[in-house]
Curated annotation (Swiss-Prot):
Residues 474-537, 742-772, 813-835 are annotated as: Disordered. Signal peptide: none annotated. PANTHER family: KAT8 REGULATORY NSL COMPLEX SUBUNIT 3, TESTIS DEVELOPMENT PROTEIN PRTD. Component of the NSL complex. GO terms for biological process: chromatin organization; positive regulation of transcription by RNA polymerase II; regulation of mitochondrial transcription. It comes from the Eukaryota. Its main location: nucleus. It holds the Pfam family Abhydrolase_11. It is found in: Nucleus; Mitochondrion; Cytoplasm, Cytoskeleton, Spindle pole. This is KAT8 regulatory NSL complex subunit 3. Keywords: Chromatin regulator, Cytoplasm, Cytoskeleton, Microtubule, Mitochondrion, Nucleus.
Amino acid sequence: MFRPGGERDFQTSARRMGTSLLFQLSVHERELDLVFLDHSYAKPWNAHPDASSARPTRMLFVTPRRQPEASGDSDMSIDVETVTPTPMPLYDNQKARSVMNECDRHVLFARTVADGPPPPDDWEEHINKTGWSLAQNKLFNKVLKALQAERLGRLANDGACNEPVLRRIAVDKCARKVRHALSSVSWDIKLTHWLHNTLLESLSLAMLAAYLDVLQTLKSKVPSLIDRMLLSSSVKTGAAGAEALSLLLKRPWDPAVGVLSHNKPSKLPGSPLILIAPSGPTNPAFPTSRRMRFWQSQLSCLGKVIPINVHVGSGANVGITQCLEHMIGTVRGKVIEVHSHFPHKPIILVGWNVGSLMACHVSLMEYMTAVVCLGFPLQTISGPRGDVDDPLLDMKTPVLFVVGQNALQCSPENMEEFREKIRADNSLVVVGGADDSLRINSTKMKTEGLTQTMVDRCIQDEIVDFLTGVLTRSESHGHGSGETRDLDAEKKKPRRELPFDLDRSRPSSPAVRDMSSVCSSPTASPKPKTVGLSPAQKSSLITATQLLKTHMQRSGTVLTHKQAQAQFAAFMKHNMLVRKSIPPGSPSCLFVPVPSEQVEGLERDDMRVHLKRRQTPSPTPTKASKRAKIKVTIVSHGDAAGNTPGSTAQEVGLSGKPLGLTVGQTTVSGAKELSELLSAQRSGGLAEVSGALASSEGSFHSLQGSVISRSSSPVQAAGTAQAPSASSLLQGLSLSLQEINTKSPGVPSTTQVSGGKPQGQGQVLSSLSPGSGTLVRAVPMVSTGSGMTKTTAIHQLLTNGGLAKLANSLPGLAHVSSQSSGTSSTPRSKQRRPR
């Protein structure tokens, strides 16, 4: 057996790899496909267009198909000087040799305690065969021949690097021959007693040690027959000798017992329940074989093992069909019972030979996570499985098939064809040199340096790999179905990391949600929300906080907590006074510009982009810049006295979208007064603005009075005189903007706001660019006036007074004003170009 790197310590490798003995034992036998080497994108050699669910076959200890051809050169250089280093075995060599020589130590102890001298080396010549029958002679000769062959094997393998494995193979072969010899006499009690006593008295030390090894091996296979054969010898040897012999024969030795005991398989994810389906009716009188006990102990490391026992009556009328139906019903009932007790535990059904076939049929009836078929019987009396009417083709449970390369009931080629027809996800593991029960022959063991225990452990590693993938996928699907969220949909959604995107996509106030609903749905009608504190007051708090914070940061002063509370109290008091002074039916609109001298530290790139946008106005809304330069607060007046306040507020601090300002419809004189107020307060700072808000209450009321006195008849909104909300104002303003666009079809619209039926009348001054340094606070007024003066009022607002200057400073408003002045054919439209 060739392994690259002879000086590699396989014990260290085994400890590093943990439970993956498969990597160390079978990786050197994995055949490299030349197609994969040259074309990595190609499919496996066994891939089929219909086999979408069949995974590539895994090979364990399978001899490569392409053997190296013998060289035709007669002259070959043979290196006779270099000493090839001895490869280290995969097991603990020291511990393996210790358990290997255990029977020799017991023989030396037993013969030393005995009174008589040990028998000589030519012990066979000193045996008195007088009076032996023909059956006795034949039985003795067969057993002696097997023991002599085992003795020759010991001498031949003495000092070999893998002597424990070779010794184990020789002992198993000798035990098989002795068992055949005892079976030829039907395990007759008299003959077996006579043979055992004769061998104990006559055999030499080396031959007696070999005989004890054979008894130790047969005790694990046929314990009841060996116990009956040793019953007579216990009387002669005494209690101490019988007890020592029973302890010796209790456990057969194995070279890899140390590695397997220290490196056990790890638990599977989800803590599954492993049900072992029986291969036939079970009888409590016959204990489970040692190999099956080893498999159960190894599978118990993966999860909870539940063996299923099937008891069939001993009546003569029970046929094979009835027995199979009873077994399938028992297995199905056990699966249902386990499901009822553990509804959230994954269930894995494992079966050997016929048990694997029953497991597949039960998976068609009941839900389970996976099925493991060990030694699947593919051949039947009517031919191989996989016909059109075969119910196994409709399997949906993931299944793993483990078959032997030399199996008579299932060849790897036929298994490949069968797997291609199965709908369920399936995998195949082929064990080289194994039969239907996955037992490899002695020739394969000797050439590979393996034991059956090592092969079983490699098969278990393959099972662990398959079940880990299945359970991981089932857990992910289970979490996805159990929760309301959709992980795939969340992955497809764009992730917004910028704060202004979050503010823009998710409004934080009821007013913003109402406005967004109006803009998105033409037929939506926002409902007033009953809250303890009106949204206008909340927005006023937010606005005051940000204004004070910005002013303090720019002025370099430190605002204490008490000062902030005092500022809040003053602002709230002023706000309440303003709201009380305004009549319920006539809310007002006030523009308070903050001078652009206070907005410092702006990037030059933003200014260049702003200039370019002013030179080439685009009908589409401009993109948001990274830093906001405009803060607009829209505060709508509440409902009439005694009604639930439906006022809304919106503060745009970080959004770069086009902002709409609701302007009450006024006459020309009202627009002039408003522009005078704007120009009068343009020179003041932020502190002056707050002072002006408190000191100019009379001017505010005079402005309001002039606006109300010049207004015409009120708007009829659904037959009531309620004050319009922010959403209704937007609906009316959208209609006004549409009228502007219809009267001047050549003018591209700067914003589009969809609304339902008009509940209020007003205009929208849109596309406020963030590049401007003006901070505006807008308090909406009721839009009163007839529909005949909508367009003229907006034109006058845009062409006269300080509002036109404000529009010139903003690219969006400048675009609207230029278009409106163009329709009136005034020569000043050419002079008012954006600077």
